[in-house]
């Protein structure tokens, strides 16, 4: 009888325990919509694109999120970051081949889906003094009056970085598409109108290995340990847009 009671108690605890909070990174879709962990691209076309999707699972309910800050780090297997992976900065080989938007999927509702959201992104090469490393920073926010309630255990899509295939072949083109790369979703911070700039920080994978993806297999990058885990402060991220 005691054994049966104990078994029932364990089953009940398992059923009611909150899912682990954390970060998910996947190609093309969020984790819950069968996003994939690796992209193997033949590097034979200038058309098409793929999406790098950041999603999260909260460990507690937050009634009025107004802003989110995301940090994704990447490292290449080469000694220096290939030209194919140089975006946004004036004069970079693929300056306009990277763009940022929110993400909403079937099993991962958009983090700010029902609000007028602003998405701002930055791309920093050699952020930590490493010539083969870069950092993607993004801020997503709504007006305080439009702050949105979020709930523990639900996967939410937040960001989609779209990487286009422009300048892969022909002339002019940018070398390095075939180079393996590792990308790691290192942190996400959420703030409400009341707790800015402290907020709630997530800095671990929702499931083992769910916070990193690879490009061309990622060989030679020591993925995911190769990327820095030092988080950028909220204030320093916002200063990028002033």
Feature map (PLM): residue ranges:
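Bacterial N-terminal signal peptides that target proteins for export
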Residues: 1-8
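Boundary/junction segments of secreted and surface-exposed precursor proteins
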Residues: 17-44, 221-242
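Extracellular secreted precursors and ectodomains with disulfide-bonded cysteine-rich loops/domains
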Residues: 28, 41, 91, 106, ...
